[in-house]
Amino acid sequence: MTNQLPIESISVTRIAAKGGFDEHLPQETSFLFLEQFFDKSKNKIKEVILSEEGDEEQIITYSYDNDGNLISEKHHFLFDEIEENTAFKYENNLLVEKKKEFSYGSIETTVFSYNIHKLPTSIKVLDEDGIEEESEIFEYEGKNLIHFLKQNALVGKDTEIWFRYDEKNRVIEEKRWSHNDLKTLTTYYDYTNDEDEPNIKIKNDKGAVVEAHKKELNEKKQLVKHEIQTVNNGLKTFITSYEYNELGKITFLETINQSGILERSVIANYDERGLLTSEIKSEYEVAIGNINTFTLKYEYTFYQ
């Protein structure tokens, strides 16, 4: 890969394909879908513009402190003229508060607490009156392994999660209990075939498998096949296949269901620098009972 100048901006153009949700558009109709602008000094995104059929819908701007920490994020929804401003507060480079203010008056504050190892022990979401709406409580095994996580939410949707590890500190079991349905699901991770892509089985409280993930890797340790089976409302199978280029970038993927019907596919192209230049995406849309296909083209400008 050749040396690359810092990226100044990325523009994404969406080319509508005839059929699906775009059937009312001509075959070659295209519009600017997304623009990203980068801060050269911090190598981070400073502005994002989202558009729909050529009309700007949302502008997002970001600002950072001297350490590169995000300190503000502003969303401007042009159609509704609504603004959403979020301010981030840090102590010793740890995020301790995130305050989100909406132009219609609502305020939401998220506060973070940490232990002596700088790991989060609690995350709480408060409304404008300081009343807790949601929270996450973390307990650890040793210095850095999450042993227990409790997620509290309104309307009885609390969730409790326990984790178990092997001698290599890999998660081998995750038990999740939901107050919403009073059921327990246990996820088992099997690292026999690969350290980074374990096979997975999820069992209900009766010990029956309700979901399973089986993965295949090539000699380069790249994921080439991922099979998912679920038994919710009948047995369903989804098999996703992957292909890569010499840079290790995914150039093709497709997901086929148990009936052999395409659920989604992506064909990706890259330049000699490894930058994504185009994607052809196809997705099965249940609402229309048809495949919706479109192309995304990526263009870059660079700081000199």
What do the predicted segments below correspond to?
Residues 1-304:
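Buried hydrophobic residues that stabilize the cores of well-folded domains
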